[in-house]
Swiss-Prot record:
This is Septin-8-A. The lineage of its organism: Eukaryota, Metazoa, Chordata, Craniata, Vertebrata. The gene is sept8-a. CDD domains: CDC_Septin. It comes from Xenopus laevis. Residues 376-389 have a biased composition (Basic and acidic residues). It comes from the Eukaryota. One of its GO terms (biological process) is cytoskeleton-dependent cytokinesis. Residues 406-418 have a biased composition (Polar residues). PROSITE patterns: G_SEPTIN. Residues 320-409 form a coiled coil. Residues 49-56 are annotated as: G1 motif.
Amino acid sequence: MAATDVQRASNEEKRSLAMSGHVGFDSLPDQLVSKSVTQGFCFNILCVGETGIGKSTLMNTLFNTTFETEEASHYENGVCLRPRTYDLQESNVHLKLTIVDTVGFGDQINKDDSYRSVVDYIDTQFENYLQEELKIRRSLFNFHDSRIHVCLYFITPTGHSLKSLDLVTMKKLDSKVNIIPIIAKADTISKSELHKFKIKIMSELVSNGVQIYQFPTDDDAVAEINSVMNAHLPFAVVGSTEEVKVGNKLVRARQYPWGVVQVENESHCDFVKLREMLIRVNMEDLREQTHTRHYELYRRCKLEEMGFKDNDPDTQPFSLQETYEAKRKEFLSELQRKEEEMRQMFVNKVKETEAELKERERELQEKFMQLKRIHQEESKKVEDKRRDLEEEMNSFNRRKAAMEALQSQSFQATSQQPLKKDKDRKN
């Protein structure tokens, strides 16, 4: 019997029965809540945006606390992701919150690879979770899940259009993380410009195929509010932890010479909408989407690379041992092929080196013979010059000896004439 037939038969055999008394499995939701509260929750936020755009301030405002952060410089050589984990507690619910900041994002002159560090970080967290899942003795209960649940993408309030860096980065991230675009420092542009800017942003995201996170509408309990809030994306937010007195009460706001921008006033900005959607309504859906959609996509690709794959219902499923053996044979075959390629490459390299050495030896031999001929020619020239010089010296010596003999004879003849005159005078 095929697998589909078995499944069809099992579906037909299901029957609804009435119980005559209370059993107790209606407490399962309470058990799940109790277990979840005891275990606690984790939530990981990735803040992507340029330095000084207000990422840290918004996080402080969202969670109504002050997180310890370091001042970021505008002169970073590259993009560095800096995670910080905090333990928060509200009522009896414990939350392990991790905020990951993209230090130096958008500060470089060449921004082509700015997104790469962000993508690598997200993949690394997926890989860490996958490695824990694949362990023989795994402990996912105690494992710190560092997978990114939401990416808050901070858009500079230019009022014109998205930067190419923003489009490229969000396109690279949309299949790996839930993206919620937000317009930072929304109090720097007018309401009319802000409305046009929102429309322009959503139009560019759609035209470039960027898939941002849509608040779910399949749950009747939150379908209406989520549907309304989807129409408000991207949220235009203002962050501030300072309290300003407005009327008779203190509110979180930004004080300007021309007035006050209240953070939690929905007519001033979308901060309340962001907080409602991110924390109070859809936090669990963000965690679930991360696991069931983005992580599963990464896991499937990795397992397919390792040789695992799903089978059709009508085919015989592969066992783990068969998959391992097939992958092992493939690996050994690939290793043998690589070894043969390296051996052949080494042989070719040796032959090339020998040919180069022989060619060099021939060139050196030719140069040696040429120098030897030049030396012989120069030696012959020197010998000829020496011989000519010796002949000139011998000729000179002969002429000198003849000259000296002639001078000696002339001197003797000259000295004899006075003696002869003296003799003649005496006679």
